[in-house]
């Protein structure tokens, strides 16, 4: 349940109770900051519930992006443990498809970079893709790059877990504040 009374003061005021606002409130509260989050309607009532929630490592061509993606994956596990609130993670895997040789070479470089940094990416032939995904039309596919441990989260569940975690760490979250 949302806190209903506006405090007289706060060190930080976060505007918006979507996944970004709740993440900011969570992380600042974790650092001991006095945080108030104001949401004009209800948590997740804006664009958060429209998000796809893809959680992938493949495609990262920089160490910084890989670090951010690894942090996110670890955060979702930690949130579930800390709050008891599910994040909706489903480890469905992720596959990137290449339809021409230039793309195959580009994805091979990305896959090698990812493997160098501990991400398990497998190059698959069209036949192997068909074995994994029998309904796939692989006629134009040159190769696929499969990240078995990737998947998706439920953005609403993650937001609610972050909100709960933020409250547990002392943040005030106030809804219905137009």
What are these regions (language model features)?
Residues 4-20, 36:
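Beta1/beta-strand and adjacent pyrophosphate-binding region of the FAD-binding site
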Residues 25, 29, 165:
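Gly/Ala-rich phosphate-binding loop of Rossmann-like dinucleotide-binding domains
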Residues 29-49:
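Glycine-rich FAD pyrophosphate-binding loop
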Residues 33, 119, 171:
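Short phosphate-binding/catalytic loops that engage adenosine nucleotides
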Residues 39, 125-126, 175-177:
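Short loop/edge segments at beta-strand edges and connector loops
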Residues 53-132:
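Dinucleotide-binding Rossmann-like beta1-alpha1 core, especially the glycine-rich loop
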Residues 146-178:
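Helical element adjacent to the flavin cofactor pocket in flavoenzyme catalytic cores
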């Amino acid at each position: 349940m949302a806190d209903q009374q506006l405090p007289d003061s706060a060190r930080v005021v976060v505007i918006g109770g979507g996944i970004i606002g709740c993440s900011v409130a969570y992380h600042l509260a974790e650092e001991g900051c006095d945080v108030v989050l104001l949401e004009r309607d209800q948590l997740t009532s804006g664009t958060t519930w429209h998000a796809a929630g893809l959680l992938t490592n493949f495609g990262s061509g920089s160490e910084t992006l890989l670090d951010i993606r690894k942090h996110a994956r670890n955060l979702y596990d930690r949130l579930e443990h800390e709050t008891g609130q599910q994040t909706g993670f489903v480890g469905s895997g992720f596959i990137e498809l290449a339809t021409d040789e230039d793309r195959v070479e580009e994805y091979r470089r990305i896959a090698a970079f990812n493997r160098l940094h501990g991400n398990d990416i497998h190059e698959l032939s069209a036949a192997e893709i068909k074995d994994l995904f029998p309904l796939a039309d692989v006629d134009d596919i040159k190769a696929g790059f499969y990240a078995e441990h990737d998947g998706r989260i439920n953005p609403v569940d993650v937001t609610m877990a972050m909100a709960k975690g933020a409250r547990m760490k002392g943040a005030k979250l106030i809804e219905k504040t137009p």
